[in-house]
Amino acid sequence: PSDTVNSGAVFYLKASADPTQKWEAIALPHEPTVHRMQWVQIDAKRWDLVVQPLHGRANKNNAGVGAKMLAYEKPADPKLPWKITVVNEVGHVTHNLHATRWSASPAQEILSGSKEGIWLNSFKAGAWINTALTNVPTGELRDGKLANGQRFLATVEPFHGTTSAVYTQDAEGKWVRQQLLDGFKEGHAVACADFLGTGSDQYVVGWRGADPGIRLLTPLDAAGKTWRTSTLTTKEVAVEDFKAADLDGDGKPDLVVAGRQTKNLVILWNAR
């Protein structure tokens, strides 16, 4: 992360005719400090590879040009040049991104966090539009829905942060912050899902530093004004990342947790 000039790499892996044999690694252009990537739906038939670096090129002390989040459009032959479009280049210390869908369009929007706050990045008429939603430095972020149908944003703040907050919109559409947790170290994951089957999403937040853990935050009213905190794990897993998914087909989201420092992979099965 400290080398903002020459670090990082992006490869597309092409399967051989026999996928059990060695795959071909195709190098793609990249920004330094590349950190997160995922496929994002751009229209009904197209998915782009979106890559987020930590810092802008040649940044020092988290200052300088903005970090370039790039969208790579795959050609029919992946060995040919990929069309690359800048998604967002105004944020600094940009740790994570989240593809979501806020409209009826097939296209997904991208939520991204930065030192400047949370951005909503939308692809419209062939170009990316960046809308600032908040102004608090943000590292991790996901979105969920409350029982009243209102959307909320769940965060770790700031980069590798020590606090977690939720944002809901007021009558004027402004995102209002409510801090729910603080005092942890190196927050590194957030996920939203209806783990409890209440008709409203809850969110989980995890961290890896000092006394690691995962907490479940549950809204106690339809508008998300009051939340309850429950402990899911403690020092047994230092959370690097996690993903909510229904692994056993019972209709209930489970949680897959990866611990880098604790060198383990843990599945929290939903037993409700």
Tell where the protein language model's regions lie, with residue ranges.
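Beta-propeller-forming repeat regions
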Residues: 1-272
